[in-house]
């Protein structure tokens, strides 16, 4: 798919990886539909997209709420005319060990609220946005592409029961959708980033960063632009579907 002039929806598009992917795709002439909960960050990203050569529309919505997702995709089609691509990027963290004990006594447990908050956004939100994007593509007879942002944590990571479960789920959904939606000309895939040099990571202590990168064969963290490049590759390569691309510097080798 040539993304020039195509409408690409990005959830969590206000900052971080979402912003990087939006600006990168805008540089290829895409029309971005950015969904986030932070109006100020959305406006900043939209300005960067326009400066990069693309166009951008912004939408305030909680991806975990069905009625908001349905209404937002209706607005996107009304504003841009179509939905050609979706990057399911929105996500949150509520890290913590499932339980912590000392001398046979439980001191702390991961709460149901901490579990559910992550599942609602990182898994249910991906389902809702994927469903609505596919609905619009099929209704308009447009082929399209859905990309779910997973993580190397989908294989299981200490302190991330909720996050790992959600990221494994969105990878499985990408494979499932690739099988279900191919008949409509819709491709689906996932990206599993490793350690990426976002603003949050950059604020870590040098010794923590050194320890983090020591286990990566390429001996460095990835950049947000490298994840964005992977997304563009999936959009533009019409023979890619149902695959999870690990952009992780080899950490899972």
Label every model-predicted segment.
Residues 93-116, 139, 159-162, 202-204:
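Conserved mid-core segment of classical short-chain dehydrogenase/reductases
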Residues 84, 92, 105-127, 147, ...:
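Catalytic Tyr-X3-Lys loop
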Residues 106-114, 147-169, 174-175, 179-183:
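Catalytic loop of short-chain dehydrogenase/reductase
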Residues 6, 54-55, 82-83, 105, ...:
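Active-site loop of short-chain dehydrogenase/reductase
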Residues 3-32:
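Canonical Rossmann dinucleotide-binding motif of NAD(H)/NADP(H)-dependent dehydrogenases/reductases
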Residues 39-40, 60-72, 112, 226:
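The beta1-alpha1 cofactor-binding region of Rossmann-like NAD(H)/NADP(H)-dependent oxidoreductases
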Residues 130-131, 175:
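A short, exposed helix-loop element centered on a Lys and neighboring polar residues
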Residues 220-247, 252:
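C-terminal substrate-recognition "lid" of short-chain dehydrogenase/reductases
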């Amino acid at each position: 798919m040539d993304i020039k002039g195509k409408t690409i929806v990005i959830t969590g598009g206000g900052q971080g990886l979402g912003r990087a992917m939006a600006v990168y795709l805008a540089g290829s002439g895409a029309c971005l539909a950015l969904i986030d909960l932070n109006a100020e960050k959305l406006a900043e990203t939209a300005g960067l997209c326009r400066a990069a050569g693309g166009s951008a529309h912004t939408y305030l919505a909680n991806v975990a709420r069905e009625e908001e997702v349905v209404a937002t995709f209706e607005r996107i089609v009304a504003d841009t005319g179509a939905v050609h691509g979706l990057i399911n990027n929105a996500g949150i963290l509520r890290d913590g060990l499932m339980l912590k004990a000392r001398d046979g006594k439980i001191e702390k447990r991961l709460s149901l609220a901490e579990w559910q908050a992550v599942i609602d956004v990182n898994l249910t939100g991906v389902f809702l946005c994927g469903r609505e994007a596919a609905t619009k593509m099929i209704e308009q007879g447009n082929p399209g592409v859905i990309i779910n942002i997973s993580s190397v944590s989908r294989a299981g990571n200490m302190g991330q029961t909720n996050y790992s479960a959600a990221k494994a789920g969105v990878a499985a959904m990408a494979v499932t959708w690739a099988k279900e939606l191919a008949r409509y000309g819709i491709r689906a895939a996932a990206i599993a980033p490793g350690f990426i040099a976002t603003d949050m990571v950059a604020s870590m202590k040098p010794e923590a960063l050194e320890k983090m990168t020591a286990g990566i064969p390429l001996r460095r963290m990835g950049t947000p632009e490298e994840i964005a490049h992977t997304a563009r590759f999936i959009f533009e390569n019409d023979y890619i579907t149902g695959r999870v691309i690990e952009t992780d510097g080899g950490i899972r080798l």
